[in-house]
């Protein structure tokens, strides 16, 4: 809303729907067609690392450009690409990293992912209201960098998926 207001444009439900259609299309195409090709070509861990870095850069860009409507629109759609690849490769990694039955591993992973989706609005709204519209994106970018550091720190225990 803030970026639209600053740009002097009316940005209602229809316009928001177009943006999230673009996001969803990028997510679907990248998760079904691009992610499998990337993991076959480069391997799981290099793709995870690249996606974490790329998605972190997109979120940082949103942090910088939170007040510019064009930047927000383009980067939200680009975030769909990274989300699609990351969802596919992370699901693949979770399934390979455990000896639990696939349905248990899948539902556990989905539960954690949806928990994050439930917490994010409750955290990002107050962050944006009190510290500025770009702060939730910075928080997200930082959390992806921390997850990358955790991945590197635990790489010896991840031998099953390397």
Give short role names for the model-derived ranges.
Residues 100-129:
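A late C-terminal transmembrane helix in Major Facilitator Superfamily
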Residues 126-144:
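A membrane-interface helix-boundary motif in multi-pass transporters
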Residues 45-90:
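C-terminal transmembrane helical hairpin of 12-TM major facilitator-type secondary transporters
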Residues 30-44, 128:
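Helix-to-loop junctions at the C-terminal end of transmembrane segments
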Residues 87-97, 110:
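Intracellular helix-loop hinge segments at the cytoplasmic ends of transmembrane helices
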Residues 7-26, 104:
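Loop-to-transmembrane helix entry
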Residues 20, 24, 52, 106-114:
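Small-residue-rich transmembrane alpha-helices and their cytosolic helix-loop interfaces
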Residues 141-162:
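Multi-pass alpha-helical transporter architecture, strongest
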